């Protein structure tokens, strides 16, 4: 599997530009309890337990058997690791990939101990199946935290399959660490995921709006002059922006 320096730098720049946004979003949402919403995730419907859920910078490629790979694009892909059984002794490991910018992008990989033995033999992996979850977490986190050294490349086939390659850059030499095969999720699964994501987002927005209204009402009672200043602030900002724009055009 080949990659290049432009790929490395593009992912690095993409990751850095989104860190501040994701961090601030996490801080805002940290005070809300979304456990009831999260429990309705269709990914959990078969009894799996979610142990990892983060957005990871991916290089996406579409491979055509009749021609060369199309030019790569870069996306933040939601990566979920789910397990059947206990985390230190799983019966099955399921990986799910989804994308906020493409609601129909949804791929799944189910790996049990027998399937892992084949992977282990073919790719000369040294970790046991019980340690595979920790390896996956570490690789995903490395791609987030060290994008100049670790790259996740997802290659999609037109027949609906995909392959995720984890690549490490060591002094301009690219080493393939792990490859995992995926399949496009069934239409019914995709529909359920889209419905859940829409409803979850709407419910979270309603919760945040209710919180803002509650805070607003408290301020009205405790400090009416402050709420008056807050309401005037957008008007002052707009007037300031218009004034600046006018002076720049002269």
Indicate where each model-derived feature is located:
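A short, charged
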Residues: 126-147, 200-219
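Functionally constrained cores in energy, signaling, and assembly domains
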Residues: 106, 168, 222
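Sequence-level detector for tyrosine residue identity
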Residues: 12-14, 52, 116, 150, ...
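Extended assembly-interface/linker segments at domain junctions
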Residues: 131-192
């Amino acid at each position: 599997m080949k990659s290049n320096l432009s790929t490395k730098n593009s992912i690095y720049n993409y990751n850095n530009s989104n860190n501040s946004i994701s961090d601030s979003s996490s801080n805002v949402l940290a005070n809300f309890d979304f456990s009831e919403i999260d429990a309705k995730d269709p990914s959990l419907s078969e009894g799996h337990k979610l142990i990892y859920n983060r957005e990871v910078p991916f290089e996406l490629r579409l491979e055509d058997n009749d021609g060369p790979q199309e030019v790569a694009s870069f996306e933040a892909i939601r990566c979920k690791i789910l397990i059947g059984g206990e985390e230190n002794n799983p019966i099955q490991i399921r990986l799910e990939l989804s994308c906020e910018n493409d609601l129909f992008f949804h791929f799944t990989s189910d790996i049990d101990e027998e399937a892992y033995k084949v992977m282990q033999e073919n790719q000369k992996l040294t970790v046991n199946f019980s340690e595979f979850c920790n390896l996956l977490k570490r690789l995903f986190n490395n791609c987030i935290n060290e994008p100049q050294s670790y790259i996740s490349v997802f290659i999609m086939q037109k027949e609906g399959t995909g392959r995720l390659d984890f690549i490490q850059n060591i002094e301009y030499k690219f080493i393939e660490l792990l490859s995992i095969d995926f399949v496009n999720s069934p239409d019914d699964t995709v529909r359920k995921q889209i419905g859940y994501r829409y409803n979850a987002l709407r419910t979270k927005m309603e919760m945040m709006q209710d919180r803002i209204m509650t805070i607003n009402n408290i301020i009205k009672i405790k400090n009416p002059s402050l709420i008056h200043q807050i309401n005037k602030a957008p008007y002052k900002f707009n007037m300031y922006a218009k004034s600046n724009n006018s002076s720049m055009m002269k």
